[in-house]
Amino acid sequence: MVHICRLLVLMGMLLCLSAQFASSQHWSHGWYPGGKREIDIYDTSEVSGEIKLCEAGKCSYLRPQGRNILKTILLDALIRDFQKRK
């Protein structure tokens, strides 16, 4: 039993140390994963009509579809179940 406890402590310490030395993705302020940078659309002189509409709140494709998420998930599950039965 003592050997198992020591082994678990040693494994925990190795896990903590390996997490410190592992190379992980890091991005700086203003940068997003994948090397994409945040672009300030207000600095550009040419703003398309679609962006102006979206700023006014009339853009339907940028709004989160919170009500339809559950409905979509259930419909997809039913379709997959129906296709498996065929």
UniProtKB/Swiss-Prot annotation:
The modification Glycine amide is found at residue 34. One of its GO terms (molecular function) is gonadotropin hormone-releasing hormone activity. Residues 1-24 form the signal peptide. It is found in: Secreted. Keywords: Amidation, Cleavage on pair of basic residues, Hormone, Pyrrolidone carboxylic acid, Secreted, Signal. The modification Pyrrolidone carboxylic acid is found at residue 25. InterPro entries: GnRH, Gonadoliberin. Pfam families: GnRH (PF00446). One of its GO terms (cellular component) is extracellular space. PROSITE patterns: GNRH (PS00473). The keyword Metal-binding does not apply. Belongs to the GnRH family. Stimulates the secretion of gonadotropins. PANTHER family: GONADOLIBERIN, PROGONADOLIBERIN. This is Progonadoliberin-2. It comes from Rutilus rutilus (Roach). The gene is gnrh2.
